[in-house]
Regions:
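Conserved AMP-binding/adenylate-forming
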Residues: 25, 41-85, 187-190, 390
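Conserved pre-ATP/AMP-binding loop-to-beta segment of ANL
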Residues: 15-16, 130-148, 155, 178-184
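Gly/Ser/Thr-rich phosphate-binding loop
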Residues: 230-234, 243-302, 314
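Conserved structural elements of the adenylate-forming
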Residues: 33-38, 159-180, 188, 297, ...
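AMP-binding/adenylate-forming catalytic core of the ANL superfamily
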Residues: 85, 337, 342-343, 365-452, ...
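Conserved ATP/PPi-binding loop(s) of AMP-dependent carboxylate-activating enzymes
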Residues: 308-312, 323-353, 357, 389-391
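Conserved AMP-binding/adenylation subdomain of ANL enzymes
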Residues: 167-184, 191-231, 245
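Conserved AMP-binding A3 loop
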Residues: 28-30, 144-171
Length: 477
């Protein structure tokens, strides 16, 4: 069993159908197979063998798909690496995971001891010395891919999926996404972070990927009008960007707009719907699990509704003892279903040791309503404790972001001698907006309980985020 069969089958069934369109280039499933086959042979010639770790560095577009499928076809365990990671972040990954080589499009200047460097088409294959030519995840039979978690509140962890897991997960995700052969997705996320429930699923089921020429609202809308995709799939920042599109520009009414990767604040969803006449759906995904929740329209309130459990998945809200809580009670969000991850790397930890009676604890605190929908309150590790009261950064950020002229915000806690912790907030003004901090503080005092109010509030030019678009909650050393 190998996920490469997704491509061979797609090329057999739909050889002339477009698989991916990006930067003026459209590549069919047949062409994608041909290029992947050629690169597979090149990988074998340079020494890649089944079970070895293979890094993949490529931009969103055809070459990412070519590199991913060529690596899978060779039997390697593929680990996509974002082009936008800092050198120290990449070097840390290379320390933790003994990759045999890195397949890269363009330059790759990180600390990778090389024994050979081979150029093949648009790719270079940088091979490490022979002591790295070993099975990268020997505890996982038929390992397929590795991806590091985003590390929003701590160190990132390597997550391993087997080919069996990829088969199960893609089968479940296409049902949850409600897409079918011949559909197209306007893709506005980094492929290096989203490639199983999305990219591999799309290829398996004959769904085209459309990569816009850029991330400006004008470019996104132009791509949507040109390709008429059934779905736009992006992060909350994409929704915010489109809200600020010049007047007169519109999105296709038949196109679903899906937000994923982090919380979409309700006020942004409402503004988007007023602007375009289209509701925003949220999908809740985790690399350890897949897409367990979604298809819910973003609702009001102090949190973000991520809908209900998608087909084949179960969800529960657990107390500290691991017991299920009734509707209306806040606890730890737990999910389970097909395609659960196989293991963590560095240190190695099989999934069975990380799960609680088969449940994966997401790290989010949430409430389940009586109709089964889930409202995420915030990350357990991000909760700020102010004199015994719990403050969720996401709630405070939502109120700050509702203030006219605010583009984004970040809220976090700092130690305080009397209250234990205090709330600190940073806010990014929209371009051209003039924000009176005193007026903003007054606005917050009218919307929030006293203990939730920021003790320090300042305007900043930008908010630090992880490469997958999530707010970075911890200072990076």
């Amino acid at each position: 069993m190998n996920a490469y069969s997704f491509l061979t089958r797609a090329a057999e069934l739909w050889p002339s159908k477009v698989a991916v369109a990006a930067r003026g280039e459209s590549v069919t499933f047949g062409e994608l197979l041909k290029r992947s086959e050629e690169l597979k042979h090149a990988l074998f010639e340079t020494g890649i063998r089944p079970g070895m770790g293979l890094g993949l560095v490529a931009a969103n577009g055809p070459e990412f798909l070519v590199g991913l499928f060529a690596g899978l076809a060779s039997g390697a365990v593929v680990m996509p690496i974002s082009e936008n990671l800092r050198p120290q972040e990449v070097n840390r990954m290379l320390e933790l995971v003994p990759l045999a080589g890195v397949l890269h499009e363009g330059s790759f200047s990180h600390d990778l001891p090389r024994s050979t460097e081979t150029q093949r088409g648009r790719f270079s294959i940088a091979m490490r010395p022979r002591e790295y030519h070993l099975k990268v995840a020997p505890g996982v039979p038929n390992a397929a891919v590795i991806r590091f978690t985003s590390g929003t509140t701590g160190s990132a962890k390597g997550v391993v999926l087997s080919h069996q897991t990829v088969f199960e997960r893609t089968e479940a995700s296409v049902e949850g996404l409600q897409l079918s052969q011949g559909d197209a997705v306007l893709w506005v996320l980094p492929m290096a972070y989203h490639f199983v429930v999305s990219i591999l699923t799309y290829v398996r089921y004959g769904i085209a990927v459309v990569v816009p020429d850029g991330d400006s609202p004008e470019q996104l809308i132009s791509s949507a009008q040109q390709h008429s995709p059934q779905m736009l799939y992006g992060a909350p920042a994409v929704v915010q960007s489109l809200i600020n599109a010049p007047s007169g520009l519109s999105l296709p009414r038949s196109m679903r707009v899906v937000s994923t990767s982090s919380c979409l604040y309700p006020q942004h969803a409402r503004t988007f719907e007023q602007r375009f006449g289209t509701s925003v759906e949220q999908l809740y995904g985790l690399f350890e699990v897949g897409l367990p929740l979604g298809s819910g329209l973003v609702s009001g309130g102090d949190g973000a509704s991520v809908g209900r459990a998608l087909p084949r998945y179960e969800v529960a809200i657990l107390d500290p003892a691991g017991q299920s809580l009734p509707a209306g009670h806040m606890g730890s969000l737990a999910v389970r279903g097909p395609g659960m991850f196989d293991a963590y790397l560095a240190p190695y930890r099989p999934a069975a040791d990380a799960l609680l009676h088969g449940w994966f604890l997401t790290g989010d605190l949430a409430v389940q309503s009586y109709d089964g929908s889930i409202t995420v309150k915030g990350r357990e590790k991000s909760v700020i404790n102010v004199a015994g009261n719990k403050v969720f950064p996401e709630e405070v950020e939502g109120v700050i972001n509702s203030y006219p002229g605010i583009q984004a915000s970040r809220v976090y806690g700092l130690e305080h001698t009397q209250s234990g912790e205090m709330v600190v907030a940073e806010a990014v003004p929209q371009q051209g907006a003039s924000i009176d901090v005193t007026a903003l503080a007054t606005y917050l005092s009218e919307k929030l309980s006293r203990y939730k109010l920021p003790s320090a509030l300042r305007l900043v030019d930008s908010i630090e985020r992880t490469d997958s678009g999530k707010i970075r909650r911890v200072a990076q050393g």
